[in-house]
């Protein structure tokens, strides 16, 4: 309730707002502090909703959420939908593509990302990444993977990958997380996990004719 109200008030006041969850708090906004093996490599990662930012840090006791105003003016943007390109990009940066890293289709996707100031893409949490990894390991086909992943509804992430992009971010506020908020967040995460498992089970039965990774990246 309160969380949602807070988010709506911020959005009403500033319109273009993004949220960033931090496990220990931010001393500065930077790209260099980012890990290499995130979804799209190094960058400053933000999401469209407060809850979504919260869901990535609610397990940690000192975690908090920040809101930012942003602009996409004069920036090079690479957008992804919930599709094969998106899945391959994330598996590339998270290091599970193995022999396919130098495949021409993969290289093309990575080049576009490296040229961009900002990447906008559906969010993938660890549960979703586990499904993607099953695809890259040849255990499930692309249709099964994408159908299961479309259940997630985590919204979009905005990855600011260059200094030029970071200049378009203006901090608004910092929010500390209450105990009930953390509890509620864990409950939602467990429900989501169950939902994705169910979807995967059904998709395996339904999409038997989809292509496997070795057929796509010949």
Regions found by a protein language model. Name each.
Residues 1-4:
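Short, small-residue-biased leader/transition segments that mark boundaries at the very start
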Residues 21-28:
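Short polar catalytic/cofactor-binding loops
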Residues 8-16, 31-42, 48-110:
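ADP-ribosyltransferase catalytic core
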Residues 72-218:
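Active-site and NAD+-binding cores of ADP-ribose-processing enzymes
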Residues 42-45, 119-121:
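Short cationic amphipathic helices and targeting signals
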């Amino acid at each position: 309730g309160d969380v949602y109200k807070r988010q709506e008030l911020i959005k009403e006041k500033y319109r273009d707002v993004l949220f960033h969850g931090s496990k220990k708090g931010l001393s500065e906004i930077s790209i260099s502090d980012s890990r290499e093996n995130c979804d799209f490599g190094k960058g400053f990662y933000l999401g469209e909703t407060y809850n979504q930012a919260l869901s990535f840090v609610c397990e940690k006791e000192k975690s908090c959420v920040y809101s930012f105003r942003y602009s996409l003016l004069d920036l090079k943007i690479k957008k992804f939908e919930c599709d094969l390109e998106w899945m391959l990009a994330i598996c590339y940066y998270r290091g599970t593509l193995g022999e396919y890293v130098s495949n021409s289709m993969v290289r093309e996707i990575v080049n576009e990302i490296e040229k961009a100031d900002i990447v906008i893409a559906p969010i993938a949490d660890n549960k979703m990444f586990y499904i993607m990894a099953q695809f890259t390991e040849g255990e499930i086909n692309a249709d099964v993977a994408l159908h299961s992943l479309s259940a997630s509804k985590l919204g979009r992430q905005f990855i600011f990958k260059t200094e030029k992009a970071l200049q378009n971010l203006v901090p608004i506020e910092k929010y500390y997380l209450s105990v009930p908020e953390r509890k509620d967040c864990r409950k939602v995460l467990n429900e989501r996990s169950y939902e994705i498992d169910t979807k995967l089970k059904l998709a395996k039965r339904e999409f038997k004719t989809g292509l496997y990774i070795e057929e796509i990246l010949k």
